[in-house]
Amino acid sequence: MAARGVIAPVGESLRYAEYLQPSAKRPDADVDQQRLVRSLIAVGLGVAALAFAGRYAFRIWKPLEQVITETAKKISTPSFSSYYKGGFEQKMSRREAGLILGVSPSAGKAKIRTAHRRVMILNHPDKGGSPYVAAKINEAKDLLETTTKH
């Protein structure tokens, strides 16, 4: 190993920067160090700004949480959905049969048949529909047709 101030062999000077004489050091080393310092300062300021923003958000969240929950309670969720929420009744009624087919319980046979066809095409078991739902659709059609006079 070379002593301080003595020029090292060419191979070692490329590997170990401490063996280089001060005049042989890279001229842009100070620029790189300044960039590093600037980057660290920018990162530090960014973290500080993020911390202050988070602190502000947490402070303002408590009052906003109450306002949001009150507003959510005022909005009625059933009005957003056009679908019937709930399962099937134990014994099917005319009202439920009408809901399944999408017709009035007092609809005529022609309207019931067209509605049955439309709903069955969408829910047929051969096309990936549920056999249980298909059975309920058929049951609704049978119930409405047997109780309808025209």
UniProtKB/Swiss-Prot annotation:
The modification Phosphoserine is found at S104. Negative regulator of the mitochondrial respiratory chain. Prevents mitochondrial hyperpolarization state and restricts mitochondrial generation of ATP. Acts as an import component of the TIM23 translocase complex. Stimulates the ATPase activity of HSPA9. GO terms for molecular function: ATPase activator activity. Expressed at highest levels in heart, followed by liver and kidney. It is linked to Absent or down-regulated in many advanced cases of ovarian adenocarcinoma, due to hypermethylation and allelic loss. Loss of expression correlates with increased resistance to antineoplastic drugs, such as cisplatin. GO terms for biological process: cellular response to starvation; intracellular protein transport; mitochondrial electron transport, NADH to ubiquinone; negative regulation of mitochondrial electron transport, NADH to ubiquinone; negative regulation of protein-containing complex assembly; protein import into mitochondrial matrix; protein-containing complex assembly; regulation of lipid metabolic process. The lineage of its organism: Eukaryota, Metazoa, Chordata, Craniata, Vertebrata. It comes from the Eukaryota. It is found in: Mitochondrion inner membrane. The keyword Chaperone applies. This is DnaJ homolog subfamily C member 15. Interacts with the TIM23 complex. Directly interacts with PAM16/MAGMAS; this interaction counteracts DNAJC15-dependent stimulation of HSPA9 ATPase activity. Associates with complex I of the mitochondrial electron transfer chain; this interaction may interfere with the formation of supercomplexes that facilitate the transfer of electrons between complexes. Keywords: Chaperone, Membrane, Mitochondrion, Mitochondrion inner membrane, Phosphoprotein, Protein transport, Translocation, Transmembrane, Transmembrane helix, Transport. The chain crosses the membrane at residues 36-58. GO terms for cellular component: mitochondrial inner membrane; mitochondrion; PAM complex, Tim23 associated import motor; TIM23 mitochondrial import inner membrane translocase complex. Residues 1-35 are mitochondrial intermembrane. It is a single-pass membrane protein. Residues 96-150 form the J domain. Residues 59-150 are mitochondrial matrix. It comes from Homo sapiens.
